């Protein structure tokens, strides 16, 4: 990939958005490729704010609803990065065009519906390029960081149980809010509050689904609930882990209430209801940030066959910046020739966890506690 595509451009769809801007900034620093910022309307490349007047930035008007235009634009690209949404509205359009012209794809979203659709297509006809989807913080880092913890602590031991707890708070964009509301209905699968046993979701009772988790700094103690996670189920199957549990919570108080309302009223069932609930969630989360700071936290607990437990916690203060950097690091690994399989895959299945985390930590965006006895200077002063 590195030798063949070195002079071909990278297309960043949604490169003028909050996540897309971070992707472009990183790629300008760490690659030599021309970067095409594709959007629905005529924005200049300098409006991106990454590096004004950088000769490597080019703008392109591109409609994700026009399959022919997508194929034409993607045919000469080294890589397509999709930072557009909502994922539940976008569907397979971008991925399908990439498959048809044999261009690799990194998608910030996608989630379970796209994963299943692409796997079904892949069973009918082989896909000749990597399609890495759900490359963000959740899902994305929620699969790769647990893999990293296991890769760093197993030392030949067999993991018997894996628990993850993910919390988040930010002023969610409408597209993010749309996908959050859509996920509240488990994308139509209705698996309740599940424990993952031998890679399969098994629902448990409401009171068995709750867990309180303590995060570092000023985040403190947080109430979380079991939630379905196809990503964690795939990781458990990949590593033959008998039991896994994914807990989560939206820790913005107003946003949490908006999510609870959407869940109880079934506002995830139709696009019209999702639209209205997403608008309310976006407004509620913006109000949360009048007095609170954005934060993303992920705790991982691994229990091994020797009955020893290893724990690690990761905290990020800027969720959209970190999401963009995670996407861009994935792109960097692909462009630099890391050995990647063809076909649809999630982040933890595609990229070596230790290489990814080494590059991520070098950006100074995250704090990790629990994997080393060495002090972390990023913790100094605490987190708010």
For each of these PLM feature ranges, what is it?
Residues 38-42, 64:
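N-terminal Rossmann-fold cofactor-binding loop
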Residues 108-130:
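Rossmann-fold NAD(P)-binding glycine/threonine-rich loop
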Residues 29-34:
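Conserved S-adenosyl-L-methionine
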Residues 61-77, 86:
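Conserved Rossmann-fold cofactor-binding substructure of NAD(P)-dependent oxidoreductases
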Residues 10-28:
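N-terminal Rossmann NAD(P)H-binding glycine-rich loop of SDR-like oxidoreductase domains
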Residues 74-80, 100-101:
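Short acidic/histidine-rich motifs immediately flanking catalytic phosphotransfer sites
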Residues 3, 20, 151-384:
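C-terminal catalytic/substrate-binding lobe primarily of soluble NAD(P)-dependent oxidoreductases
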Residues 86, 95-115:
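ADP-ribose/adenylate-binding Rossmann-like module
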